[in-house]
Swiss-Prot record:
This is Type II restriction enzyme DdeI. It comes from the Bacteria. It catalyses: Endonucleolytic cleavage of DNA to give specific double-stranded fragments with terminal 5'-phosphates. Transmembrane segments: none annotated. GO terms for biological process: DNA restriction-modification system. Its EC number is 3.1.21.4. GO terms for molecular function: type II site-specific deoxyribonuclease activity. Coiled coil: none annotated. Keywords: Endonuclease, Hydrolase, Nuclease, Restriction system. It is an enzyme of class 3 (hydrolase).
Amino acid sequence: MKAATDQELRKLIVLYNNVMEVMEHDAAKSMRDDNRAYGGFVRAAKGKIQELITERLVRTVWDVEMGENPERLSINSKKIKIPILRSYVDSINDENLKKYISSNILKYSYGLSVDKHVFIDNKFVLGIECKAYTENAMLKRILVDFYLLKTKFPKLNCFLFQLESQLGGDYSECNKFPIGSYPTRTIMSYFKNVDLNIVTLLEGERKVDRPINKPQFFKPLKVEHLEVAIGYLQESLSEI
């Protein structure tokens, strides 16, 4: 890994530390000034820092580690229209309903997005869902979203980037090739077209009663875990 890449990773660690250091204070201020729920503020803040870290990692891999032209890469989260399946329409027994849908077929679509859509030369190559943490009930929806996206973009690389893991197994060990957990792998087995790469940044299974925004439960963001994420992303982007 290039020295410049290492420097960028250490900047991300400083950013993470700074955000976590003031999160409790900012949450209390939000409750006082805006009458906002503490839990909602903290969840949103953790989600935002995860999204920011993820986007910075993608750009660091492309711009710094791979030395590619930054203008070739773009990231957004605009909704993508998933069209209705013609085979579904053909299978409808109600002829009136089938006729109605067929005559309005262009109106039938579902707008779908994940947190980060990564494009190279305007080609959608990476989809990344960002979570402060993930449990298996949440994973089901993530897999459904990617399943639908893969019907339109079959070569899409799919990622879940999470600060903490609540999936069980060894996801919380932050290894590159986790074995996973029994329930997680079982759920994933029903979405065979989705090869979901799960990247965890903070060690240790998430505990509801040990929130990392509390100083006594703080978890450090380590450079070696960011390096694992860098490796995943570089491998995928090198295939482009």
